[in-house]
Amino acid sequence: MSFVTTNDGVQIFYKDWGPKDAPVIFFHHGWPLSADDWDAQMMFFLGEGFRVIATDRRGHGRSEQVWDGHDMDHYADDTAAVVKHLGIQGAVHVGHSTGGGVVARYI
């Protein structure tokens, strides 16, 4: 499994599928879901030649279960940590429910 450590020390799980030089689509799940909820969409876009990424937001799925940091500022910072770790530039961000709020705060 793949993880990145955020600036405040939280372990965030991520999926990163596809060619590293392909256009990137980054998926953000809703509450109380996980990255797995995007698998069908990720498989579709992977088949179309995209690099697809999804995370389990802090406190969800395989990411570290923490009591604090459950706000849009931390979620956006967590996204930035994954983007930096993976060296992503120019990604399209797609969010559902709370994930949409994360996208709005991040961009």
Place the predicted regions along the sequence by residue.
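Conserved HGGG/HGGXW glycine-rich cap/lid loop of the alpha/beta-hydrolase fold
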Residues: V10-Q65
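Short glycine-enriched nucleophile-adjacent loop
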Residues: G100-I107
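Active-site loop/oxyanion-hole signature of alpha/beta-hydrolase fold enzymes
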Residues: N7, G47, R51-V94, T98
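N-terminal cap/lid segment of alpha/beta-hydrolase-fold proteins
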Residues: M1-Q11
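Generic alpha-helical structural signal
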Residues: D39, A76-A80, A104
